[in-house]
Each structure stands twice: as structure tokens, then as C-alpha cells.
């Protein structure tokens, strides 16, 4: 199992399996951002490590970007990487606002370079 925090500050290749504008397969909400995973990883839920891709405003199939933070769910074993184009910056408040469509169902903290220790 991979520790999601080790990705903070690093470039990451993401495979997008839920493009922005598509509907969640079980819950019916629309993804306002691209959502995917890091291939060949295993996270706390036994599946690949999930990622939100922020700062890109078109549907993607793959994306290489920088991990600026991790959403660590405190009531679920499924951390999410926050991946952005290199040199983009998002505040914790902006990350919360952009991921609220799905994260509102969970309790979480945002871990970034300044809070990871």
C-alpha cells in the first residue's frame, strides 16, 4: 500500500477514468473536474490511488502534473491526490471548493507541503 503523502511536490502521471462533464457510475453526480488514478499503485481501499486534476478545463485521458496536496479522509480509507499543471497553486479553500461535489460526503483534512509533517 502506497503512502499518498510521498507524492506531494512530485510530478505524477494520471490515467483519467472519469472525465470532467461525465456522470458518476453509481451516484449520478457530474464530475466538474477530471478524476483518475495513478496506475500500478494500491491505496487504502485496495484500488489504485485516486487523483483530482485541477486547473485543466477540458476532458482528458491522461495528464502529467504536480501533486500539491492530499485529501486525507478521516472516516474512509481512500486518500486523494490533488494534481495540477506545474507552477499552478491552489489554496486549501480552493481545493475544498473544487472537490466539494464528492468530498462533502466525507470528513477529511488537506495535507500539503506545509502540513505534511
What is the predicted function of each stretch?
Residues 1-117:
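Hydrophobic N-terminal alpha-helices or hydrophobic patches in metabolic proteins across all domains
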Amino acid at each position: 500500500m502506497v503512502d499518498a503523502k510521498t507524492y506531494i511536490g512530485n510530478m505524477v502521471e494520471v490515467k483519467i477514468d472519469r472525465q470532467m462533464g461525465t456522470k458518476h457510475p453509481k451516484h449520478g453526480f457530474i464530475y466538474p473536474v477530471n478524476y483518475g488514478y495513478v496506475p500500478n499503485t494500491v491505496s487504502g481501499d485496495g484500488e489504485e490511488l485516486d487523483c483530482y486534476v485541477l486547473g485543466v478545463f477540458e476532458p482528458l485521458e491522461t495528464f502529467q502534473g504536480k501533486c500539491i496536496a492530499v485529501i486525507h479522509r478521516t472516516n474512509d480509507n481512500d486518500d486523494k491526490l490533488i494534481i495540477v499543471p506545474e507552477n499552478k497553486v491552489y489554496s486549501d479553500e480552493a481545493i475544498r471548493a473544487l472537490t466539494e461535489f464528492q468530498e462533502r460526503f466525507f470528513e477529511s483534512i488537506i495535507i500539503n507541503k506545509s502540513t505534511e509533517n
